[in-house]
Amino acid sequence: LSFSIMKAEQTIRDKVTVPMPNSQRYNVSLFFQDYFPGYKKVKLNLKGVLAGGLPITAPRKGYEDGFFRMSPYKRIDLGLSYQIAGATEEIMQRGIMSKLKNIWIGVDVFNILNIKNVSSYYWVTDIYNQQYAVPNYLTGRQLNLRLIAEF
């Protein structure tokens, strides 16, 4: 478990104090991994992230003209791994396999809750020179298959 509280500010022309472009207010992260009881070849992992949004300004305008923050970043990933072969198994003693310690196969579900996090904004300007922020979203839920060979 990791918890951070952050504050990065700058003063512009000795009159306006604004957040730095990378100033997230908070970040909470969790990573948990464990074996299934009685099944040392099966591991489950869980990762969660909650982070405050970054400050954004419109193009051709500065922080003095105002800013807003992106929505908070939220994500939960879930993974399951199975050990195909370990160093003590007979198959791992022959040929090229003798160079390996373990072989794992796994499946992950990234962003299991399918949360639409904002990555940036596309700015649209109307005929009256008003600018509107249109969000660009990160990828939703993804399925990942993996094969890990430990040397």
Annotated model-derived regions:
Residues 22-28, 72-76, 101, 139-143:
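Residues that define the transmembrane beta-barrel architecture of outer-membrane proteins
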Residues 38-77, 90:
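Extracytoplasmic gating/loop element in the C-terminal half of outer-membrane beta-barrel translocons
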Residues 6, 40-42, 46-49, 77, ...:
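A general secondary-structure boundary signal
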Residues 1-57:
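Gram-negative outer-membrane beta-barrel transporters
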Residues 50-59, 82-151:
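C-terminal beta-signal and adjacent terminal beta-strands/loops
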